[in-house]
C-alpha cells in the first residue's frame, strides 16, 4: 500500500514524518537544518520578478523583501481574509497549499515514491470552517487529506506509541506559534487513546511573544534615537528575526546580545541597534501572555471531570514550551513535572505519522477516539441556540432531534447551523443555512421536522432535515462563505501547477543563459588567442554572432537566446578547428620533448591512468 505521510501544518514551522519499519522518521526539508530545526518554515514569498519561494528560501530573503513575504497565515485559515502581493490576491488556503506542495515534493525525493495522501494535524480548537480550509489546502497541493487529527491528540499518540498497556490520564499543553490547545486524554491499557476534553485559544501563541519583544526593542531604540523602527517594513523584518532568535537563545542562556548594524539612518548618518537582552526581561515581557493559558487548562480539566491531582502526565508541545517560564507555569499550575522524553517540535508530526500507519494497517493495536471542540446546534424560535452535539463529544458522532414549526400553516423552515458555546444564536458562528420547504399546511407545533447532525472523524459536519409527514428531506455538507467551492479549488490547483511549470521554465532559462554565457566567454578567448589564424570575413561573422548573443542575453526570451547561441556555435566552427589544430601541434611538440628527456615521459604517459592492483602479504608463502 502507498505510504501516507503525517504533516504538522504549523503557524511558524511545519514538519512531516512517515512510519517505516515500526519507527517514525522525520522527513527533512531539501534545505536541511534551519533556525526551526529540521522543519519547513511556514513562509511563502514572491520576488519582484514573480518567482515563488517556499519554506527556508522564503524565510532567508524576508528582510530584503518584507512586502513580498508572508507568514503566520494559519491564523487566517477559515476566514475571508486575502493577502495582497505584487497586485495579486492569495487566500490562506493557497498559501498553506504552497507549504504542503513543498512538503509533498521533498517527501517524494526523500522516500523515492509518489505521495498522494496525508494525515494533517490541526489545532484542537479549530472550528469547522478552519478544518475545511485545511482540507481545501491539501486538495490544492494535490494531496488527499485522509484524516485531520487534533494536534494534542497527535502528540499523545507519539508519546504513547511505545507505552501501550499502561493506563494514564495525560494533559497535553500545546502552545505553538499561533495557537494554544489544552487536551485531556485517557490512554487505555488496550491501546485506546480517548480524548476526554479540549480547550484553547486560536489567537494565542509564540507570535504574540515575538510581537511583545519587537515592541520592547523598538521602543528602546525610539527613546535613544527618536526613530520608530516599526514604520520601516525592512527594519521590522530584521527586528522580527532578532526577536525570534533571542527568544530561542534565552531558553538555554541567561543573556544574549541583539546587534543590528545599519538598521536605519537619519540626517546625521546610519544608526545601529545594539543591546543586551536578558531572560528576566524576556519573562517579564511575556508573562501576561503565558498567564492567559491558565483559563484553558482549568476549562479542560473541568470538562474532563478531573482534578489536577488525577492527571498522570503532562506533555509539552510546540516551540514556545521550550521556554523555562512556560515549562514552570504549566508544571506549577498542574502540580506535576512535565514529560521530558518527547521533542515538542517533532511529536505532532510523529503522531500524525502514527495515525497514518493506523489507517494503512501498519499499526493495529491503537484506537484513536477524538472529540469535537465546540458545541454544534441550530437556531430555534426567539433566536436561541439549541445544541445537538455538545463540545467534547467523541467523534464520529450522530445526533437527531425533532423540531416543529413556529407559525400556523408555515410552508418552510430555515435551518441555521451554529457552532459555539453562547446561548443566543447571533453570538455563535453560523456554519451554513438551508431551507426545507413543501411542508403541508398545519397548525404550529404539529409538523415533525427531524434534524440530524452527523460529524465525521475529521470533525467536519453534515446536516439533514426531514419532514416526517411527507418524507421530504434536505441536507447540507457545511459550505459557509469561507469554504472553497470545487471551482475555486480547481482554479487554485491550476495556479499552483502554473507556478511549478514557471519554475521549470525559469530553470531552463537559467541553463540556456549559462550555456550561452560560457560559449561567449570561450569564443572571445579563442578569438583573442587565435583570431589572426582565420580570415577577415570569418572573424567578422564571429564578432557579429558574439554581439547578437550578448544582446540576446540582455532579454529574457529563451528561444532568442537559444537561437543566438546556436548561431554563434555555427559561426565559430572555423575558429574551433584552428584552436584544435593548434592544440594538436602543441601535444606533438610536447611528446617529442618528453622522449628526449627519458623518465619524465614515463610519468606523463601514466598520468591520468588507473591501475588495478592486488595487495600482497609478503610474509605469506
Curated annotation (Swiss-Prot):
Biased composition (Polar residues): 583-605
Residues carrying Phosphothreonine: 179
Coiled coil: none
Gene3D superfamilies recorded: 1.20.1270.10, 3.30.420.40, Actin, Chain A, domain 4, Substrate Binding Domain Of DNAk, Chain A, domain 1
Cross-referenced SUPFAM superfamilies: Actin-like ATPase domain (SSF53067), Heat shock protein 70kD (HSP70), C-terminal subdomain (SSF100934), Heat shock protein 70kD (HSP70), peptide-binding domain (SSF100920)
PROSITE patterns membership: HSP70_1, HSP70_2, HSP70_3
Region of interest (Disordered), residue spans: 583-621
Expression induction: By stress conditions e.g. heat shock.
Compositional bias ranges of the Basic and acidic residues kind: 606-621
Keywords of the record: ATP-binding, Chaperone, Nucleotide-binding, Phosphoprotein, Stress response
Single GO MF annotation: unfolded protein binding
Function noted in UniProt: Acts as a chaperone.
UniProt cross-references to NCBIfam families, sorted A to Z: PRK00290.1, prok_dnaK
PANTHER family: HEAT SHOCK PROTEIN 70KDA
Family: Belongs to the heat shock protein 70 family.
Protein name per UniProt: Chaperone protein DnaK
Organism: Endomicrobium trichonymphae
Organism taxonomic ancestry: Bacteria, Pseudomonadati, Elusimicrobiota, Endomicrobiia, Endomicrobiales
Gene name, Swiss-Prot/TrEMBL: dnaK
Amino acid at each position: 500500500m502507498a505510504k501516507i505521510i503525517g504533516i504538522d501544518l504549523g503557524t511558524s514551522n511545519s514538519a512531516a514524518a512517515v512510519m517505516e519499519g515500526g519507527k517514525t522518521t522525520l522527513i527533512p526539508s531539501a534545505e536541511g537544518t534551519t533556525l526551526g530545526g529540521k522543519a519547513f518554515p511556514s513562509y511563502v514569498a514572491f520576488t519582484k520578478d514573480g518567482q515563488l519561494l517556499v519554506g527556508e528560501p522564503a524565510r532567508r530573503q524576508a528582510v530584503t523583501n518584507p512586502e513580498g513575504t508572508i507568514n503566520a497565515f494559519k491564523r487566517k485559515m477559515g476566514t475571508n481574509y486575502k493577502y495582497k502581493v505584487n497586485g495579486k490576491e492569495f487566500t490562506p488556503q493557497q498559501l498553506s497549499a504552497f507549504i504542503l506542495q513543498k512538503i509533498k515534493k521533498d517527501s517524494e525525493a526523500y522516500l523515492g515514491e509518489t505521495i498522494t495522501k496525508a494525515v494533517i494535524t490541526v489545532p484542537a480548537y479549530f472550528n469547522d470552517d478552519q478544518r475545511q480550509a485545511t482540507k481545501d489546502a491539501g486538495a490544492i497541493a494535490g494531496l488527499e487529506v485522509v484524516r485531520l487529527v487534533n494536534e494534542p491528540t497527535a502528540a499523545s499518540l507519539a508519546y504513547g506509541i511505545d507505552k501501550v498497556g499502561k493506563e494514564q490520564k495525560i494533559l497535553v499543553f500545546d502552545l505553538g506559534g499561533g495557537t494554544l490547545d489544552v487536551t485531556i486524554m485517557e490512554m487505555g491499557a488496550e491501546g485506546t487513546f480517548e480524548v476526554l476534553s479540549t480547550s484553547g485559544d486560536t489567537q494565542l501563541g509564540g507570535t504574540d511573544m515575538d510581537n511583545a519583544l519587537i515592541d520592547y526593542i523598538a521602543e528602546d531604540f525610539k527613546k535613544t534615537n527618536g526613530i520608530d523602527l516599526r514604520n520601516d517594513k525592512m527594519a521590522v523584518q530584521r527586528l522580527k528575526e532578532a526577536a525570534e532568535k533571542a527568544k530561542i537563545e534565552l531558553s538555554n542562556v541567561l543573556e544574549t546580545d541583539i546587534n543590528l548594524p545599519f538598521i536605519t539612518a537619519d540626517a546625521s548618518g546610519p544608526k545601529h541597534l545594539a543591546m543586551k537582552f536578558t531572560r528576566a526581561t524576556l519573562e517579564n515581557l511575556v508573562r501576561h501572555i503565558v498567564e492567559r493559558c491558565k483559563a484553558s487548562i482549568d476549562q479542560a480539566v473541568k470538562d474532563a471531570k478531573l482534578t489536577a491531582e488525577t492527571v498522570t502526565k503532562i506533555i509539552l508541545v510546540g516551540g514556545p514550551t521550550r521556554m523555562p517560564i512556560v515549562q514552570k507555569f504549566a508544571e506549577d499550575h498542574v502540580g506535576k513535572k512535565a514529560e521530558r522524553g518527547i521533542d515538542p517540535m517533532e511529536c505532532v508530526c510523529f503522531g500524525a505519522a502514527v495515525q497514518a500507519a493506523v489507517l494503512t494497517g501498519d499499526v493495529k493495536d491503537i484506537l484513536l477516539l477524538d472529540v469535537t471542540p465546540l458545541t454544534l446546534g441550530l437556531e430555534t424560535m426567539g433566536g436561541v441556540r439549541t445544541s445537538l452535539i455538545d463540545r467534547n463529544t467523541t467523534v464520529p458522532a450522530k445526533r437527531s432531534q425533532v423540531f416543529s414549526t413556529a407559525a400556523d400553516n408555515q410552508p418552510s423552515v430555515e435551518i441555521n447551523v451554529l457552532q459555539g458555546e453562547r446561548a443566543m444564536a447571533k453570538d455563535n458562528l453560523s456554519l451554513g443555512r438551508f431551507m426545507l420547504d413543501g411542508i403541508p399546511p398545519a397548525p404550529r407545533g404539529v409538523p415533525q421536522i427531524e434534524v440530524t447532525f452527523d460529524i465525521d472523524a475529521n470533525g467536519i459536519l453534515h446536516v439533514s432535515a426531514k419532514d416526517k409527514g411527507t418524507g421530504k428531506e434536505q441536507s447540507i455538507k457545511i459550505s459557509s462563505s469561507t469554504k472553497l467551492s470545487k471551482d475555486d479549488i480547481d482554479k487554485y490547483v491550476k495556479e499552483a501547477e502554473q507556478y511549478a511549470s514557471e519554475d521549470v521554465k525559469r530553470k531552463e532559462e537559467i541553463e540556456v543563459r549559462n550555456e550561452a554565457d560560457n560559449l561567449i566567454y570561450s569564443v572571445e578567448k579563442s578569438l583573442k588567442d587565435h583570431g589572426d589564424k582565420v580570415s577577415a570575413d570569418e572573424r567578422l561573422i564571429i564578432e557579429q554572432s558574439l554581439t547578437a548573443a550578448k544582446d540576446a542575453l540582455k532579454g529574457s526570451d529563451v528561444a532568442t537566446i537559444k537561437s543566438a547561441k546556436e548561431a554563434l556555435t555555427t559561426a565559430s566552427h572555423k575558429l574551433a578547428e584552428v584552436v584544435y589544430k593548434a592544440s594538436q601541434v602543441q601535444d606533438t611538440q610536447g611528446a617529442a620533448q618528453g622522449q628526449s628527456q627519458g623518465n619524465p615521459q614515463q610519468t606523463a604517459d601514466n598520468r591520468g591512468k588507473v591501475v588495478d592492483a592486488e595487495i600482497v602479504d609478503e610474509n605469506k608463502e
